[in-house]
């Protein structure tokens, strides 16, 4: 251990257990930001366990977990060198199962860490500090920087776990039960939850709540124990080091399954979204929203995990948290806000806006003012012609709603665009000939190229509701027509402050064309290469 003087007295004894850490172990926190210049590492754990008893007297100790793991491995030792077992699972705490008091916890670290270092030194091996100088371990001078990165259990990684034959019992149902459970009030034990599986974070939060472990400890206990047990059977398993899970380099080497089979857990293919909070509605409700046919199956394919929408539980948004008027369970976020808030990644509109920011879509959408809505855009989701009052909503069964949603989704037809051959092949923009000749715009080629990028997008198909919708990316504020008016019919030669600060014709052309090129990350023509579009006049 060449950097022994900077290793904490926690010593060479902490084993593999923390290796799958999502955020750290027990009261120790993984450093998420660089703590100093030097070698980047994903295994820097700041040991600050004593803060549970009050203000720390010394700065936390920076502990390089993987470096100690390697040292233990050379000695033929494993996780049990540092971690005791509880109910056949290794505890995340160092050399103890419970924190009794500050003195005993402090003594546990000092005695075992320094003791281990002394043993190694006596055996002629390199080791960490063995003296009693506090600054040998409690130092602000950490010769490393953190490159720790959270790991995401996406669909591919989840599928590899459910389909794995390496998990002790094997088979999908058994594999699910290895991680997913619920608390049985009668037996006061954790039991499997077939058909009710949800994200771990639905129950395990960032902090400990009553007797429920936080997500940090729950993840380490479940994941690391499984990896260690599978590795002991000489079978393929997940990472056994912090670096293996939490460095960007190693995450980039994780095998990705491209076509992940749909995981069927009794979820619906289609959902009819209505105002479920019928208690807040009266028979004469004037603002009752029209139903939305939600393609649940398509959204599963478009997202890495269920938490993209179900961020607290698998129950429907309106039934569980978000009511018409707002409720404490939903953070007082109303149903309308949960669905429509533009800047939220958890709302429908916010998520769609994020997808529209992709370069294939941004050429048009980056130039459309946020928040612009119309009856046509609302009708993309809220079905026209289907009027349901409060009485009808209350009378509909779950099966009726599913059938109606499925029929509405089936009836949706992609609008496409106008016949390409009917569009002008070229358009010469010559309104402002001065120093340069008019710009020859390859209209048909550009339409074909841009449309090909979104033609297979289900999101685009759902919201491009007429053949002219696609054209309105350029021909904005105009009727969706095969023959839209010329730009000069709205944009005068000069800036007009009296008409919503409408830019002049020259500015409008450059803003539209260069703005689109920039949003789509096109290198040519460059914004400053005037002659690439306009031939200079002789």
Regions flagged by a language model, labelled:
Residues 139-144, 247-253, 324-327, 369-370, ...:
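Short Cys/His-rich micro-motifs in 6-15 aa windows
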Residues 2-12:
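Bacterial N-terminal signal peptides that target proteins for export
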Residues 113, 132-138, 198-200, 223, ...:
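Cysteine-rich micro-motifs
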Residues 119-128, 139, 231-232, 369-370, ...:
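Short, exposed beta-strand-loop hairpins at the edges of beta-sheets
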Residues 29-126, 143-194, 201-231, 255-311, ...:
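Sequence context of c-type cytochrome heme-c attachment sites
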Residues 81-84, 131, 135-136, 178, ...:
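Iron-sulfur cluster-binding cysteine motifs and their immediate structural context
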Residues 222-249, 354-396, 530-536:
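Repeat-solenoid scaffold signature
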Residues 11-23:
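Bacterial N-terminal signal peptides
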């Amino acid at each position: 251990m060449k950097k022994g003087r900077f290793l904490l007295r926690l010593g060479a004894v902490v084993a593999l257990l923390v290796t799958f850490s999502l955020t750290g172990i027990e009261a120790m926190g993984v450093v998420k930001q660089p703590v100093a210049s030097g070698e980047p590492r994903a295994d820097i754990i700041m040991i600050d366990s004593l803060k549970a008893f009050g203000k720390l007297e010394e700065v936390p100790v920076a502990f390089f977990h993987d470096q100690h793991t390697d040292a233990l491995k050379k000695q033929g030792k494993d996780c049990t060198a540092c971690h005791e077992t509880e109910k056949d699972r290794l505890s995340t705490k160092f050399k103890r199962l419970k924190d009794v008091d500050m003195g005993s916890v402090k003594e546990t670290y000092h005695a075992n860490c320094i003791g281990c270092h002394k043993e190694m030194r006596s055996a002629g091996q390199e080791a960490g500090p063995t003296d009693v100088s506090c600054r040998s371990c409690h130092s602000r001078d950490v010769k490393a920087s953190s490159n720790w990165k959270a790991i995401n259990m996406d669909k591919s990684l989840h599928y590899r776990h459910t389909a794995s034959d390496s998990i002790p019992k094997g088979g999908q149902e058994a594999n699910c039960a290895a991680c997913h459970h619920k608390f049985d009030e009668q037996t006061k034990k954790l039991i499997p939850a077939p058909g009710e599986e949800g994200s771990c974070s639905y129950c395990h939060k960032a902090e400990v709540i009553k007797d429920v472990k936080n997500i940090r400890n729950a993840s380490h206990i479940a994941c690391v124990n499984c990896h260690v047990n599978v590795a002991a059977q000489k079978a393929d398993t997940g990472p056994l080091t912090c670096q293996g899970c939490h460095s960007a380099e190693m995450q980039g080497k994780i095998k990705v399954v491209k076509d992940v089979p749909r995981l069927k857990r009794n979820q619906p293919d289609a959902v009819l979204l209505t105002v479920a909070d019928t208690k807040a509605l009266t028979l004469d409700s004037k603002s009752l929203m029209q139903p939305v046919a939600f393609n649940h199956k398509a959204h599963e394919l478009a997202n890495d995990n269920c938490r993209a929408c179900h961020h607290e539980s698998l129950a429907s948004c309106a039934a569980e948290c978000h009511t018409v008027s707002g409720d404490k369970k939903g953070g007082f976020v109303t149903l309308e806000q949960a669905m429509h808030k533009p800047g939220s990644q958890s709302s429908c509109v916010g998520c769609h806006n994020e997808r529209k920011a992709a370069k294939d879509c941004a050429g048009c959408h980056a130039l459309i003012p946020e928040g612009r809505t119309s009856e046509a855009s609302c009708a993309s989701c809220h079905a026209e012609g289907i009027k349901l009052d409060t009485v009808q909503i209350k009378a509909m069964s779950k099966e009726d709603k599913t059938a109606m949603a499925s029929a509405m989704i089936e009836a949706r037809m992609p609008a496409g665009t106008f016949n390409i051959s009917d569009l002008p092949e070229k358009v010469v923009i010559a309104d402002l000939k001065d120093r340069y000749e008019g710009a020859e715009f390859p209209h048909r080629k550009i339409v074909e190229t841009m449309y090909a990028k979104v033609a297979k997008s289900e999101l685009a198909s759902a919201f491009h509701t007429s053949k002219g919708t696609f054209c309105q990316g350029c021909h904005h504020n105009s009727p969706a027509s095969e023959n839209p008016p010329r730009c000069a019919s709205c944009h005068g030669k000069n800036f007009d402050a009296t008409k919503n600060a409408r830019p002049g014709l020259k500015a409008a052309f450059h803003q539209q064309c260069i703005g689109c090129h920039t949003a789509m990350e096109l290198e040519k023509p460059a914004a400053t290469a005037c002659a690439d579009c306009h031939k200079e006049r002789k």
